Every structure is written in C-alpha cells, then in structure tokens.
C-alpha cells in the first residue's frame, strides 16, 4: 500500500534578499512525504523565483500527477520540472534507504555585505579557509577592490566568486584589473563571469582567473568537458533535477579532474540538511555551497546544526494533497 502527502510552506525571508531583479519576501514550496510498508521518505520541492523555469503552481500540478500515479502502484519517470524531480527523488531515496544519513555541514561562509564581517568570521575558522562572495551586484571595480582586500587580509584564503552572468567582457576586465595578479590563483573559481560561456572562457584565458560553470550546467545540450580555465562544476539540485541526474554530472566532472560542488538554491533548513547529505555522499572532499540558512527567518522541521532560528513544525503546515 502506497500513500503520499504534499504540504505547502511559506517562510519569511530576511530583508534585503534580492534574486536578480526581484526582492524575495517569502520562500515558498512544498514538502512531499511518501509512505510504503511502514516507512516514510521526505523531500522538498521549492522552485527558486528568477532562476527556476517552473512556477510554484506548475510544480504543484506536476508533483500531484506524479504522486497520484505512484500511489496507484506505478513507477513514473522523473518529472521534467527539476525542482519536482529533485524533491521526489530525495523522498524515494529516503524511503528506500539509499540517501546516507551522514551529512557535510561544512560551509563556505557567504559575504553579503561588509567584508570586515567576513574577515572576522574567517579568522575564527580552523582548517581550510574558503569563503564565497557574490559579485556583479555593484560596480565591477568595487567588486575587484573588495576581493583584493580579502585576499590581502587573509593570506591562506581561497575565494569562490559568483557573478551570475552579470558582466560584459569590459566589466569583467575592469574587475580583474583591481585584483593583484599574484593573488589571482587564490580565487578557487569565479562562477559564470560573463553573459555567455564563450565570453567567460575568453576572460579566464586573458586573466588567469579560474572559472566554474553554474547556469551553463542547466543550458540545453550541456556536456561536462575539459576546458582551459574551467576548474569546477557547481550543481544546484533544485535547478538541475533528480539525484540520478546530479550524480551523473558529479561523476563526469570527477572523471575529468574537475571539482564538483553541491550548492543551495535557498532551500529551507529541511532541504539544506538533505543537500548536506547529498554533498557528503557524492562530493565528500569538497566544501558545499550551503551557507544560506540564515537568509530565512524560520527553520522547517529539520534543523541546521548550531543555528538559533525558530522552528516550524509539521503540524503548522497545510496539507494541499493526499492519497
């Protein structure tokens, strides 16, 4: 006997979270619960505004169709909507016991504002010092100055930068001018500096700054391949698709000597704890990009360790579908 439920959630965001051109006030999504033979499996379905192609309503419709078929004893193929495919594949993996419990909670701290705050937190960090800075939100020259300041202040720091395809080649060049050439090799990678992969590759070859693919992974026809200047593949499962799809990309990246990074799409604490398990399972030697729990004012059912943020329980969620 198979049963399934779909719960909806809407969690308030901290002020100032902007995705491309939209301020995000709440993080909305669904939790899916599968039940069979006295066991349960859970997953989160939360398309990310401005980044996911599917809307919340489309995700709900697709999830309900998949769940209805599953409850009738069918084994439907993965949804074509990445957020649905990922959430349901996590629920199936929990149900079948194939998603290991061990999690990788190491995080690359995210610098959202004052670089001095990041310097303080990194000075307290033991072991490998890795941090992430979003660039492309302000002037490219300012970004270059901030990155240079961080690399100068902390000699053993490795920086991950993310530009979200924000820059023209001229702006990317303006950024690089302000980063001391002798420190550029401590930029672990810069995700998607320019609007096209071709421009990003040219930027890397001109500046010696390593790059990583993120949005490109989700382009139609994407293939993992060795390219000069590309050192990493960033995988955001909510935007990429099922666990099997993510695992395939990780294995292809590792086979070519590229680093694979499991990264957040601002999921709830519930989704983040699952991503930490996925990261430990598929990329145990890499620090995942999951330092987003404090962007949301409430945690959801499962807590991120050592975080003092109020918790929403299952009883507080609305059931939107069950069978």
From Swiss-Prot:
UniProt keyword Lyase, yes or no: yes
Binding, Mg(2+): 162, 191, 214
Name of the protein in its database record: o-succinylbenzoate synthase
Active site: 134, 236
Cofactor requirements of the protein: a divalent metal cation
Keywords assigned: Lyase, Magnesium, Menaquinone biosynthesis, Metal-binding
Annotated NCBIfam families: menC_gam_Gplu, PRK05105.1
Function (record text): Converts 2-succinyl-6-hydroxy-2,4-cyclohexadiene-1-carboxylate (SHCHC) to 2-succinylbenzoate (OSB).
Pfam family, any one: MenC_N
Family affiliation: Belongs to the mandelate racemase/muconate lactonizing enzyme family. MenC type 1 subfamily.
Catalyzed chemical reaction(s): (1R,6R)-6-hydroxy-2-succinyl-cyclohexa-2,4-diene-1-carboxylate = 2-succinylbenzoate + H2O
